[in-house]
């Protein structure tokens, strides 16, 4: 007979990984109550506590998304197009947006009082414009639902490979309001979405749901639950959602350790996962780089802090005397346009190319406020992949390398292997870079800003 876990005691030994045990702490034992759930990460022994009320919220929300998916197959593409149009229209409406902005201002106020980063939390006019543009893009994207992408013909019969939705896609995002445009993109390919947003942005998220999202869903005729927000500030709501087998795909974006933990929850539940926990784009310059183009790429890749903002720049030694000044000028201009000072991290190899003007102290904007720091600091080679979570002061790492081949090796060893770009006018050099780099997004003369949901939405 199955028995329920009713309580935990301090010192209790919980098996994991086949031959290991985790020990229940006094804190966990005192907080765990009858009806709660315990998830044991089989690779690390982490004990994750899900209170009963949080589990219920997640269960019911995923159920809505799952049921909506079952209904979505009978909804025509015009209704989905209408949803994107209305959602964009409502975000563009100043009266509706005013209520959303009030909630966002409150979120920002609370986050700042806690010393939390607000870089991605502030719902600026630019973020609003980008959200609307993202929704317009989905509005005008042709549907691929039911399209035959391959056909094999035989005598008297044939077989077709036809695109179809996966199901309910679960997203967990950090606290940034613009994820709505990212997450809802999965509707275009016939999927539904259920997501949890970081607690810092929960007031904003609920305001968007009330004033723009739900009205667009209702008026377009999409099933209730096609886009569902797990309305809980508890981190454990993410554990609950990613342990629900009704999800067809789990997508997590945020800090490295937290995302890895969420990924483990989904994987041991049997849910396919797409994870991105550490960001930062890498850029490589060589003697074949056009200096003006190189400067432009650096400058435009520091217009905001997102997961694929320029984070680490590698310049070959033979090109350093030309490209490092261009790099520093672009970094200065990117900071100046924001009314801030830039922060630079360098390896020992880059030190000879840094002028004295960059070696003083400046005011750097941090989550806790302005802090006076040395503008240029030397770091170890093992630290060049650290993602700098900057506020308003652009922050990057500069490495001078012996060759492009060394830059490729460093990128494959220390980067998050997410976005890599090179500026070169030599086709053979770029081909070697492309072949050697292990990253899903690789470019020449650009850094790739991509939607979090772009790949998943193809479903």
List each model region and its residues:
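A structured beta-alpha segment of the ubiquitous adenosine-cofactor-binding alpha/beta core
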Residues: 158, 227-245
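ALDH superfamily catalytic-core signature
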Residues: 90-95, 174-175, 181-192, 211-219, ...
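Conserved small/polar residues in nucleotide/adenosyl-binding loops
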Residues: 449-456
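Conserved small-residue-rich beta-alpha loop and adjacent elements
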Residues: 133, 137-216, 220, 248, ...
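Conserved glycine-rich beta-strand-loop-beta hairpin in the small C-terminal domain of fold type I
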Residues: 388-395, 414-418, 440-441
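N-terminal Rossmann-like NAD(P)+-binding subdomain of aldehyde/semialdehyde dehydrogenases
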Residues: 1-160
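Short, well-ordered beta-strand elements within core beta-sheets of diverse protein domains
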Residues: 68-74, 314-315, 393-402, 417-422
């Amino acid at each position: 007979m199955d028995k329920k876990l009713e309580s935990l005691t301090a010192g209790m030994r919980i098996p994991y990984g086949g031959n290991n045990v985790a020990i229940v702490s006094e804190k966990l034992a005192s907080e765990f109550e009858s009806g709660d759930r315990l998830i044991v990460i089989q690779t690390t022994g982490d004990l994750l506590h899900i209170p009963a009320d949080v589990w219920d919220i997640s269960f019911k929300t995923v159920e809505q998304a799952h049921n909506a998916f079952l209904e979505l197959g009978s909804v025509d593409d015009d209704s989905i197009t209408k949803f994107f149009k209305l959602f964009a229209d409502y975000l563009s409406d100043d009266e509706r947006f005013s209520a959303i902005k009030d909630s966002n201002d409150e979120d920002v106020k609370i986050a700042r009082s806690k010393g939390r980063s607000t870089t991605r939390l502030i719902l600026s006019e630019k973020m609003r414009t980008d959200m609307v543009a993202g929704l317009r893009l989905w509005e005008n994207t042709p549907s691929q639902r039911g399209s035959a992408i391959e056909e094999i013909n035989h005598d008297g019969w044939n077989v077709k490979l036809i695109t179809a939705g996966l199901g309910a896609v679960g997203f967990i995002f950090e606290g940034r309001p613009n994820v709505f445009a990212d997450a809802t993109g999965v509707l275009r390919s016939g999927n539904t979405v259920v997501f949890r947003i970081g607690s810092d942005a929960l007031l904003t998220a609920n305001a968007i749901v009330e004033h723009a999202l739900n009205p667009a869903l209702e008026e377009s005729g999409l099933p209730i639950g096609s886009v569902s927000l797990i309305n809980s500030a508890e981190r454990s709501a993410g554990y609950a959602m990613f342990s629900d087998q009704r999800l067809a795909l789990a997508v997590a974006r945020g800090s490295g350790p937290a995302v890895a933990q969420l990924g483990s929850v989904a994987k041991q539940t049997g849910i396919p996962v797409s994870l991105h926990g550490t960001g930062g784009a890498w850029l490589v310059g060589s003697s074949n780089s056009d200096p003006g183009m190189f400067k432009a790429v650096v400058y435009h890749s520091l217009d905001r802090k997102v997961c694929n903002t320029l984070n680490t720049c590698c310049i070959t030694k033979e090109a350093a005397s030309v490209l490092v000044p261009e790099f520093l000028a672009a970094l200065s201009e990117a900071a100046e346009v924001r009314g801030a000072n830039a922060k630079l991290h360098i390896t020992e190899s880059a030190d000879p190319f840094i002028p004295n003007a960059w070696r003083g102290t400046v005011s750097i904007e941090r989550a806790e406020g302005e802090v006076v720091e040395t503008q240029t600091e030397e770091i170890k080679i093992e630290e060049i992949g650290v993602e700098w979570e900057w506020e308003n002061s652009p922050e990057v790492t500069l490495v001078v390398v012996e060759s492009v081949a060394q830059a490729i090796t460093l990128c494959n060893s220390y980067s998050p292997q997410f976005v890599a770009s090179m500026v070169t006018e030599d086709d053979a050099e770029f081909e070697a870079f492309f072949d050697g780099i292990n990253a899903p997004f690789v470019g020449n003369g650009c850094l790739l800003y991509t939607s979090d949901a772009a790949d998943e939405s193809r479903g």
